[in-house]
């Protein structure tokens, strides 16, 4: 008798779960028209909800198939094990390396001095230094930071901001779905 009761209770729970999923899907497709603070508050509320997930953002609800363990373990862990194995081999050979005397391992002072650049013409270096300062000042006058520009990092953040501002304009003037706001979480 208790098994039958638990079986019926399980069925009711599954039905309620399906109903809440249908309500959540229709809630995510609800069109809202908000501007300014109200839009930001709605975005925070949508992103802060614990009930939505990346799976609810996708249109299709494909069942998840279990993946093999090799796919779950990231590849960098395998690379780390290779590095650890190589380091352990190195440590095993370390006593042979320590047999070298300190004088053999350190180069002499004249050998080090040949790598130090000699300042022959200080006025020429001063002119190059002034040109470098002028170039830096002209780069600072540019609208974007030079370091980010050369690294290519500013384009991604600019594109992301432009996409979000376009979505904000659309939400303010036309309206947008909560699902489209949730994509920016």
Curated annotation (Swiss-Prot):
Main location: secreted
GO molecular function, one term: hormone activity
Entry's localization field: Secreted
Pyrrolidone carboxylic acid sites (modified residues): 162
InterPro entries in UniProt: Insulin-like, Insulin-like_sf, Insulin_CS, Insulin_family, Relaxin, Repro_Hormone_Insulin-like
Keywords: Cleavage on pair of basic residues, Disulfide bond, Hormone, Pyrrolidone carboxylic acid, Secreted, Signal
Prosegment residue ranges: 56-157
Cystine crosslinks: 35-172, 47-185, 171-176
Function, as annotated: Relaxin is an ovarian hormone that acts with estrogen to produce dilatation of the birth canal in many mammals. May be involved in remodeling of connective tissues during pregnancy, promoting growth of pubic ligaments and ripening of the cervix.
PANTHER family: PRORELAXIN H2 (PTHR12004:SF13), RELAXIN (PTHR12004)
Subunit structure: Heterodimer of a B chain and an A chain linked by two disulfide bonds.
UniProt protein name: Prorelaxin H2
Organism this protein belongs to: Homo sapiens
Lineage: Eukaryota, Metazoa, Chordata, Craniata, Vertebrata
Gene: RLN2
């Amino acid at each position: 008798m208790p098994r039958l009761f638990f079986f019926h209770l399980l069925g009711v729970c599954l039905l309620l779960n399906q109903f809440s999923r249908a309500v959540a899907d229709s809630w995510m497709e609800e069109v809202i028209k908000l501007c300014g603070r109200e839009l930001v508050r709605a975005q925070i509320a949508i992103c802060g909800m614990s009930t939505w997930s990346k799976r609810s953002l996708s249109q299709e609800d494909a069942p998840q198939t279990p993946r093999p363990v090799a796919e779950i373990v990231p590849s960098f862990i395998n690379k780390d094990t290779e590095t650890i194995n190589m380091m352990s081999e190195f440590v095993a050979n370390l006593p042979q390396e320590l047999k070298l005397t300190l004088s053999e391992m350190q180069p002499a002072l004249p050998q080090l001095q040949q790598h130090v650049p000699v300042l022959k013409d200080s006025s020429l270096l001063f002119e190059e230094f002034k040109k470098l300062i002028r170039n830096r000042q002209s780069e600072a006058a540019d609208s974007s930071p030079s370091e980010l520009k050369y690294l290519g990092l500013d384009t991604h953040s600019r594109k992301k901001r432009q996409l979000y501002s376009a979505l904000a304009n659309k939400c303010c003037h036309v309206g947008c779905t909560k699902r489209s706001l949730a994509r920016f979480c």
